Amino acid sequence: MTTVTRFAPSPTGYIHVGNLRTALMNWAIARKSGGTFILRLDDTDRERSKQEYSDGIMEDLEWLGLTWDRLERQSDRLDRYAEAADELRRAGRFYECFESPTELDLKRKKLLNMGKPPVYDRAALKLSDEERARLREERGGYWRFLLDQERIEWTDGILGPISIDAASVSDPVLIRADGQVLYTFASSVDDIDMGVTFIVRGGDHVTNTATQIQIMQALGGTPPSFAHHSLLTGAQGEALSKRLGTLSLRDLRARGVEPMALLSLMARLGSSQPVELFRTHEELLAGFDVGTFGAAPTKFDAEDLFPLTRHYVQGLPFEAVRGRIAALGVPDDLAEPFWRVAKDNIGVLEDLGGWWTLFSEGAEPQIDPEDEDFIRQAMTLLPPPPYGPESWAQFTAAVKEATGRKGKGLFMPLRKALTGQAHGPDMSEVMPLLQKVRAKG
């Protein structure tokens, strides 16, 4: 049987690190097994779903290289959901309810005050036909799925054996009074129709899974296998949900995080395997195993992405960055030497721009007060550009002879005057790249 997985984001916002884990795991399972990966946009929320978010989701996945085999939109399948709803009505598994949100809230509070679980009391099932007709005229009705009150069990790919008593769960609302088909229902119909065989999603969906198993069975479908991964927390264990707006993929991308650095962290975070940098998707897939992930909340710190990014970019061959370097305006004959000098001194590729500005426009000199006279004298001994591989040795030898300085007292002030930095690349490699020197004699 072909493995079919899906990633089903709602286009009500951009992808963040939390749902990236879901996307990556489902993609990896499909790719590793030679199966099919579906991108399904769960866009039935007409008010909140935006085309810009749909486009953004696809752009982010393409940036990461998480390509899909099929694209589906729930908004194209509304007629199918209506058919499935009729099927459930005929089977006696779909019933209309009329309570207002306020009335439901009062019921919940009453049950909680009595020390009972806030499970819907199925009062709507006791209404007569006349009462239903009267209520329909007063307010719109919404629809619930009638759960069989038995234990719902499955073996989870991460959590292990799961058993949930359906009597402890409210009959789920599947269609709102305004006609909007809700996630629990549309997703169940889609997963059956699209032949989905394996679903990985967050641990906050476990109860949803229990109800969806019954919905799928009521529609004559075979539920897929499920695995529920842990939820992410902040670095100190705090809830991450309020911070997800600052952890969208496009925000991390804007900060210079590389796709493979992000995927490498997410492919191992929360698993029994150590995080390591993968340079290709093939390397990542070779070491991926959903069974190595645990149930405990997983700490995520965005700062962990930057050592991985630095390691990744510093290992790139020149050909991989040739276009970016050319776009900076680096002359062709200096492009490869520039990369060789700059690569070990950058954290993200965007740092290259700062290095080329330094080389092409000159650095603001950093001169300690006690070195001012020394630098003025030294600069009189430095000829104008261009410089060659021997220029640094020749310059420092001349300054040493003229001033008597040597060692750190000679080299450090000169480096700071020419580059504005106390540390950096070997000056013998820097000099041939310097187009301008701003320190004056």
UniProtKB/Swiss-Prot annotation:
- Where does this one sit in the cell? Cytoplasm
GO-annotated biological processes: glutamyl-tRNA aminoacylation
Q: Name one GO cellular component term.
A: cytoplasm
The UniProt keywords, alphabetically, are:
Aminoacyl-tRNA synthetase, ATP-binding, Cytoplasm, Ligase, Nucleotide-binding, Protein biosynthesis
UniProt motif ('KMSKS' region) ranges: 239-243
Which reaction is catalysed here? tRNA(Glu) + L-glutamate + ATP = L-glutamyl-tRNA(Glu) + AMP + diphosphate
Documented EC number(s) = 6.1.1.17
Query: TM segments?
Result: none
| Domain of life of the native organism | Bacteria
Positions bound to ATP: K242
Its predominant location is cytoplasm
- Motif 'HIGH' region is found at 9-19
Gene Ontology MF annotations? ATP binding; glutamate-tRNA ligase activity; tRNA binding
**Matching InterPro entries:** aa-tRNA-synth_I_cd-bd, aa-tRNA-synth_I_codon-bd_sub2, aa-tRNA-synth_I_CS, aa_tRNA-synth_I_cd-bd_sf, Glu-tRNA-ligase_bac/mito, Glu/Gln-tRNA-synth, Glu/Gln-tRNA-synth_Ib_cat-dom, GluQ/Sye
Q: What family is it from?
A: Belongs to the class-I aminoacyl-tRNA synthetase family. Glutamate--tRNA ligase type 1 subfamily.
State the function annotated in the UniProt record. Answer: Catalyzes the attachment of glutamate to tRNA(Glu) in a two-step reaction: glutamate is first activated by ATP to form Glu-AMP and then transferred to the acceptor end of tRNA(Glu).
Query: What's the subunit arrangement here?
Result: Monomer.
NCBIfam families with a match to the protein in the record: gltX_bact
Protein name, please? Glutamate--tRNA ligase 2
